[in-house]
Regions:
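Hydrophobic core segments of alpha-helical transmembrane domains in multi-pass membrane transport
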Residues: 1, 36-47, 88-94, 120, ...
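Transmembrane helix-bundle core of multi-pass membrane transporters
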Residues: 1-52, 79, 145, 150, ...
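Short loop segments and helix-boundary regions at transmembrane helix junctions
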Residues: 1-7, 49-56, 61, 111-126, ...
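Helix-loop-helix "hairpin" substructures at the membrane interface of multi-pass membrane proteins
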Residues: 25-105, 129-130, 134
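Hydrophobic transmembrane-helix microenvironments that flank and shape a buried ionizable site
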Residues: 36, 62, 113-116, 153, ...
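Hydrophobic aliphatic residue packing
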Residues: 62-63, 74-79, 96, 119-122, ...
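Hydrophobic/aromatic residues within transmembrane alpha-helices
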Residues: 68-69, 122, 138, 174
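Transmembrane alpha-helical segments in multi-pass inner-membrane proteins
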Residues: 81-91, 101-161
Length: 183
């Protein structure tokens, strides 16, 4: 709406450096290294925040049962606002990292990475921060192997087929815990 539909370029915040391993047979770009390090750091901080702080406990309580959390003295509206702010901040960080890896911006730039991020969260287990990260890594490995050994055009379909298989076999995801509701 503001910039129109023509592609825009985004300069990388990391620069254009890389590390070569195994006599140059494996080249890892600086963007990849920074992205992996940032994801690990964010996962650790978010896990500690949600398990060790009052606000994290409040967030988990509100996500479980809003009414009961309110009756226990938790300010539900504030907790939802903080959760939304954290999610927005994480989305902004993800957007910057994505644009550093793929510097040409179009209106549809984030659609497939967004779908794959949701797929990784479901694959790893909704509600499990480490599960989402492990799900993302496994989906990335599946996608790379399918591109290398099967077909580059079918890699997305293969990733989603694996998701369907996982949901049929283990509906809670790889690290999700099945919780039966008491009536």
């Amino acid at each position: 709406l503001i910039w129109g539909s023509s592609p825009k370029t985004f300069s990388s915040i990391v620069g254009n450096w890389s590390i070569q391993l195994f006599d140059g047979r494996l080249i890892i770009s600086g963007v990849t290294i920074v992205t992996v390090a940032a994801c690990i750091l964010i996962m650790v901080v978010l896990t500690l925040f949600t398990t060790k702080t009052r606000m994290g406990t409040a967030m988990r309580a509100v996500s479980e049962d809003k009414g009961a959390a309110g009756l226990m003295g938790i300010n539900v509206n504030t907790t939802i606002s903080v959760t939304f702010a954290i999610g927005s901040g994480l989305a902004a960080i993800a957007g910057v990292l994505l644009c550093s890896a793929y510097p040409t911006l179009m209106p549809t730039t984030g659609s497939m990475p967004g779908i794959k991020a949701f797929t990784a969260a479901v694959f790893g287990g909704i509600g499990s921060i480490p599960g989402a990260m492990i799900g993302g890594i496994l989906l990335g490995v599946i996608e790379i192997f399918s591109k290398a050994y099967i077909s580059t055009q079918l890699s997305d379909a293969i990733v989603f087929a694996v998701l369907i298989i996982v949901l049929l076999v283990k509906p809670d995801g790889l690290l999700g815990k099945h919780v039966s509701e008491k009536v």
